[in-house]
Amino acid sequence: CSVVCNRTGSNMLNGVVSAFVLNARANGHLRADYACIEIDEASTVRVFPHFKPDYMVLTNLFRDQLDRYGEIDTTMNLLSRAMKMAPDMKLLVNADDSLSTFLAMDNDNAYTTYGISEQVYQEQDSREIREGRFCKRCGEKMEYNFYHYSQLGDYHCPKCGFARPVPQFDGSHIDMSDGLSFDVGDFHVKANYRGFYNIYNILAVYGAASLAGIPLDSFNRILGDYTPQFGRNELFEIDGTRVMLNLAKNPAGFNQNIGAVMTDTAPKDIIILINDNSQDGTDVSWLWDVDFDRLKDANAASITVSGIRCQDMRLRLKYVDIPSTLEPDIEKAILSKLKNGTKNLYLLVNYTGLYTTHNILKKMEGRKS
């Protein structure tokens, strides 16, 4: 079958339209059986008037680009408006996110849930900044039996009874010692990915495929063949140095990337690039909501800060007593670590820095653009 997909990550109206145009014949007829489209939250209200999806996957609601969205309630209101534009659309919702779950319950669309019911991390007292501390239904402070990360976990409101539903697609027997391994009911999933957040991504794919009636007999093989989008655990080998590139553009995503870095106990160099172009969001105060102090235990031989807001990033690290080297030019920063580094380099970059860094690494590795 043929699928329309905005694989480049262009997730606003123009990018969505372009994905369909590229899959159309000269007469305007689509050469596709399915469409799988990522849509920017704020763009849903602009896209949905043009077509009504059969399904929408709601993965989580985190603060992102404060100057553009403001607080999380703005994003929730936009999504609620979009849902009302497509009343027959079915939702697949992350049950572990109280905000996504409330949004589904508060609208008339039919919904199905996915999530992880078992406690994976034993540490209860996390310093992470969490959304959804208070019940969206009655305003009472939420209580948690455990957290996975950010506000994701097993929650309930002690006053009105709003609580995490039991997921229809429930990940269990989680094992992250060698890639990712877990069960969904009687189905066993094995994937060569890192990062706890990827369990959620795979669960969402499994659930969406199940709801759409797509056969799952080749699910693990397809996972094995899939190459993640650039900047998502993207690995390079350059002059004997292992280079891992990851996009980190909000507190929750950054904390997950730091966690992935820390699963590698070998000595390493880390480069953090922060820009403040319009696509990044010009307000970088979110850096203060990231648990950078965890990097003290990352076995980092060096940490370099780069990009337009490298001074802000350096100041943020200074406040948790982490020394860093300042190099605004990302190419020079990379070359320095290739020449005098540990041969194990991690790059954490926000949105506009991703494309520049990716192209530099491809050129250094000798790949075709």
Language model regions located:
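A conserved, hydrophobic alpha-helical segment in the catalytic core
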Residues: 50-60, 152-166, 193-224
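Residue-level signal for inorganic ion chemistry
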Residues: 38, 59, 92, 201, ...
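Short amphipathic alpha-helix with an adjacent loop that forms part of the alpha/beta core around
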Residues: 28, 49, 259-263, 292-294, ...
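Glycine/aspartate-rich loop-and-adjacent alpha/beta segment that forms the canonical ThDP
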Residues: 347-369
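Active-site beta-alpha connecting loops in nucleotide-dependent enzymes
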Residues: 229, 247-326, 364-369
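Cys/His-rich short segments
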Residues: 117-180, 192
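Gly/charged, well-structured mid-domain segments that form the phosphate/adenylate-handling core
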Residues: 162, 174-177, 208-248
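Phosphate-binding loop of NTP-binding sites
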Residues: 1-115, 123-126, 130-134
